[in-house]
Amino acid sequence: MIKRFEIGVYNEVVRSTLRSNRDLPKSNKISPDYENVIYVQRWADSKEDALHKASFEFPKSKGFVIDYCEKIS
């Protein structure tokens, strides 16, 4: 049965750049909002499935960190 999960994600590159009082490069396509944890809701069969799907949407190779994942319904 498909369930709804809340996933918290931030971007380590954005976070470290902004917290060291540097400007994000103009080539950066990631919102500065990702300095903090952003919560999104996604549908998945299990927590593992939700994390797997989130890893494609928020790739580690681009600095994203999945900080939180919990079933909400």
Feature annotation, model-predicted:
Residues 47-73:
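Short, mixed-charge low-complexity intrinsically disordered segments
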Residues 1-26:
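Short N-terminal "domain-start" leader segments
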Residues 28-45:
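A short, exposed loop/beta-hairpin motif centered on an aromatic-Gly-Thr core
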Residues 1-5, 43-48:
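A short, structured loop/turn motif at beta-sheet edges
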Residues 12, 40-41, 69:
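Compositionally biased, intrinsically disordered low-complexity segments
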Residues 1, 32-34, 58:
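A generic structural signal for short, solvent-exposed coil/turn residues
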Residues 25-30, 59-63:
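Short, low-complexity, polar/charged sequence segments that are solvent-exposed and flexible
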